[in-house]
C-alpha cells in the first residue's frame, strides 16, 4: 500500500500523472508501470529523465542497461523504479 502511494507521489512530482489504485495487483502494477515507462522513453524522453531524477534511480544502474530494445529497456527501468521506491518505503518505516 505505501509502495503504491510512494510511486503515485513521485510520478505526480514529476508532472507525470499516474494514479495506481491502492488495491492494484502486483502483476498489474508491473505491467502498467512498464507501459508508462515505455511511452515516456519513446515519446517524452526529457520527462523520463526528470522522473528518474525525482525517484532517484542510480544513474550507474541505468547506464548498465542495454538500450537496443526499448521494450526490454522499459521493463528493466520499471524494475529499478520499483526497487528504489520500495527502498524509500522500507527506510521510512525502519527509521
Locations of the language-model features?
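Charged, compositionally biased N-terminal leader segments and the immediate start
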Residues: 1-26
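Charged, alpha-helix-enriched surfaces in structured cytosolic catalytic cores
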Residues: 2, 24, 28, 32, ...
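Hydrophobic alpha-helical segments at protein termini of multi-pass membrane proteins
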Residues: 3, 8, 47-50, 68, ...
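A short, ordered amphipathic alpha-helix with a cationic face
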Residues: 4-6, 23-24, 35-40, 49-53
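Conserved, well-folded catalytic cores of nucleic-acid-processing
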Residues: 10-14, 36, 40, 84
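Amphipathic protein-protein interaction modules
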Residues: 40-75
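Amphipathic alpha-helical binding modules
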Residues: 68-95
